[in-house]
Amino acid sequence: MDELHALAEEHEGLLTSKEARSLGIQDSVLVRLAQRGRLERMSRGVYRIAHYPTDRLAQYREAVLWAQASHHGLERIALSHETALLIYGISDLNPSRVHLTVPKSARLRRERPEWITVHQADLTEKEVGQHEGMPVTTVSRSIMDVFSTTHRTDIVRQAITEALRDGLLSSAQATGLRRIIISSTAESLSLSINGSKVTGA
């Protein structure tokens, strides 16, 4: 159990069955510990040390560990979209689901918890940063992801303004994002108008 405690310390009390196996601890041992109340099974392949203090980021860590446990060798997993904006503190949104981006080639074999939304995209190294030990898409990437999936200009404009205020974006980056959003919005409006039918003429 001491080995599991040491392992879980790296993830604020969380560990995966894959990590335990690397220490020579079989899945059956984890199952028995869970039955005895020493571990809590959070999702398939993810456990928490019982009574371990949790923090506001616990669910995000669990989502990342779930994805890592779901696919061998999965690289460039990152918390993303609305979740990333919330982590950076640049959005008033409080999404009920945790948004996570995994590579397009990923075939997640484990049952997905209903509170996780999985997006698939091939992130570059420069598009992923770290926040309190967790992989998170960069501010710029997160804003564009939210815009591409929601088309909510109010959300992304607020995020850009607050990121600029907090020093998370440079003036040049903020200007570039605003131009992309304005251009995309204008293009969408043009396509909508051109594609509409005129009746009653």
Predicted regions and their residues:
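Short gly/ser-rich loop at a beta-strand->alpha-helix junction or flexible surface loop bordering the NTP-binding
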Residues: 1-138, 145-201
